[in-house]
Amino acid sequence: MRIFVDTGAWIAIADRNDQYAKIASQFYTDLIHQRRNLITSDLILVETFNLLSRTIGSKTTVKFGNVLKTNAFLIIEPITPLDWERGWKIFDKYDDKDFSFTDCTSFALMERLKINSAFTFDIHFKQYGFYVFP
């Protein structure tokens, strides 16, 4: 099984003071032990690193990023121009849901890669129709 990893999950894994830190770290450890393929996007990591730099500092964020780079189970997918366009259509269509554009590009990527599950604490993934964990 492949699972998409969203910004909130990465933040909770990296920041021990995050409200979801304990549950996120345990779930992440379980995924690694189960040898699950983790998929995330370049936009998710940009968002993650920007937010983490403000909360845990740049130095710790860089260390976290370097750990991610060595994770054999992590695939960082670039958002393609088609994902961007599909994301915009989702963003436009569901303007009543308060989805972020980053969420919408994630939905587009997940549709393209046929991934139906997300490691996230963001209710928007469930609202759009994906299974969410933990």
Per-region residue spans from a language model:
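Short, well-structured N-terminal submotif of metal-dependent ribonuclease cores
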Residues: 1-40, 53-67, 134
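Acidic active-site catalytic centers that drive phospho-/nucleotidyl reactions
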Residues: 6, 47, 103, 122
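Amphipathic alpha-helical segments within well-ordered protein domains
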Residues: 8, 46-50, 88
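A generic structural signal for short hydrophobic patches within well-formed alpha-helices
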Residues: 10, 45, 125-126
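Short glycine/serine- and small hydrophobic-enriched flexible loop segments
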Residues: 50-53, 111
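Short acidic, glycine/proline-enriched helix-loop-strand junctions
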Residues: 68-80, 94-96, 126-134
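Active-site neighborhoods of divalent-metal-dependent phosphate/nucleic-acid chemistry enzymes
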Residues: 75-116
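Acidic, PIN/NYN-like endoribonuclease modules and their adjacent C-terminal/linker elements
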Residues: 107-108, 112-134
